[in-house]
Amino acid sequence: MAQYIFFSGKGGVGKTTMAATTAVYQSGKGKRTLLVSTDPAGNLGDIFEREVGVEPVNVSTNLTVAQMDSDAITEAYKNRMLEPLSAILDEFALAQVKEEFNGGCTVEIATFDKFTDFLGDNTYDLIVFDTAPTGHTLRLMTLPNEWDKYIKKSSEGSGQTCIGPVSQIEGARKKYEHAVQVMQDASQTKVFLVSRPEKTSVYETFRARTELEKTGIHNFHLIINGVYPNHGTTSGIFGKLAENQKAYINELRSKFPVDTSEVPMQQSEIKGVNNIALLGDITFEKKMAKIQNNFAQSKPFQEFAPASALMDLLVKKGNSRIVILTGKGGVGKTVTACSVAIKLAEKGKTLLFTTDPAAHIGQVLETEVNHIPVQVNENLWAVNIDQKEAVEEYRQKILNDAKANGYTAELIAALAEELESPCTEEIAIFEQFANLLNNPEWDYFVLDTAPTGHTLRLLELPFEYKNQIDMKAKEGANTAVNANTGLVNTKIENLINRLKNTDEAAFLLVAYPEFTPLHEGFRAMKDLERVGINAQGVFLNNILDEKDCTDDFSKERWKLQQHYLNQAKEIYRSKALFAIPLQSSEIIGIKQVKVLSGLIFN
């Protein structure tokens, strides 16, 4: 019987590295191991330094790895579902069904369906799942229950679901029911929660455990990653950071008295099977060793753009300006968004908001932030798109519109049933996103997004949604849905045009100077270009000052940064690069955010 390990945690805490480390370590003990990334922006290929795709590929003895590609998986799922229908439907009806399958709902269910396939695979002794950051991990791990309930409920009603007739997917329901049982079985499944000893990461770890316990999952192991070496002094920037970490390490250990591992920060990044294996020995065998880099000494990087160029990108040129920050999890998007918003509030009324399910704006600003805008500073408000509130508001809006447009009671009941689909959440969040950006009250919008893969998904939704509405319009004027098609289509068209217009929207990537965040940022930039959006600049975070690097550890980290800063110049050839200096304390509270904002913009 296969064993399963899930890795979860805030973006950027090192989930992928620790998942890879665990998989390499266990395979070295003789276990036939499969490592799977369910993260839309997964970077297993970067870590193993080879191509990793949907089909499992062998990377070392007893170890194969795979990356779930949502596009390929969705296409395969659609073909599988449509094949039996093509024999019984006419050409027009089949075209309509195909269009239904082009929605975001299909992407989620197809990816999830593939995930549950792994939970029934006994080819391996151990399957390790490297998941997306916490909010999306929780989404993935609660979906088996949600889909199981939804299909059961639909079978008792219309017999239809948003992904086809119940009769066609009844087998899937049984598979999802089995997935729930496997994930709740402590003898088969364990969740490794990865945390950094920092405020937002610790909060996220405790939240994840609480939410997972609600789903019947209780078997956890804690990894405290990125622990700075103890220099025995508080001098130097890393010495001060190490002191800051101690209280958080104690807090984590008090809440996880057993099954806890501490992983020291290394001088170099972790890439390649040999380094991953060494980190496994350091983590699980307490081996005293260091992973070192071979970067040569170089002159300090001098190619950062001035603050005046940053302000030119951000200041509005018309009635309002949308500033969207995106990048890999853990690169500092939230702190950067708060710092940018503080500055723009000097220029006009500013709304700072997030679409990240694991929203951290409130923790950074030390202010309670919810789905209603709250003032956090002069001219600055903050709001969090709350998933539950968004879904409920969206459902009520659709049902009220249906009643106003003369739907029969039978049609309204069918519509209400369809709105129970777990897919409703994605489009509801997009609705809130669009409504906020269409509010003329604000001079500036600053959007702190979820990590890259989910940001790209959000930004693709307007384009998909518009295509679906166009299809509805072609079905004819007799449908009540068509009554609002023109208005909705215009609204979406306007939003698409605003996001593409560099006079109205500024997209900036956030990264720090290491291989994975730089290359993930580059991939995100290319994906944005695919939908007609051009990133206009790159924030490079946690930049070390050479004079702060007084010991071997910090000197090696500085050399690593110089190497990748020069690489960033090559990767983002035409983009302005903006520096955010590493601070010796966490950026928590308005006062600290203002200090960092001053350093960025002066």
Where are these regions (language model features)?
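C-terminal lobe/tail of nucleotide-utilizing enzymes
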Residues: 180, 184-323, 496-505, 511-602
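P-loop NTPase motor core
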Residues: 42-106, 359-420, 424
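Hydrophobic "anchor" residues on beta-strands that sit immediately upstream
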Residues: 35, 126, 221, 352, ...
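Short, solvent-exposed amphipathic alpha-helical segments in soluble enzyme
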Residues: 51-52, 82, 207-213, 339-341, ...
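Switch/connector loops and helix/strand junctions flanking conserved nucleotide-binding motifs
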Residues: 42-46, 73-77, 135-139, 202-203, ...
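Extreme N-terminal starter segment of soluble prokaryotic enzymes
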Residues: 1-4
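Phosphate/Mg2+-binding loops and adjacent switch elements
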Residues: 86-194, 198-207, 405-510, 520-523
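Walker A/P-loop NTP-binding active-site region of P-loop NTPases
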Residues: 6-68, 122, 131, 141-145, ...
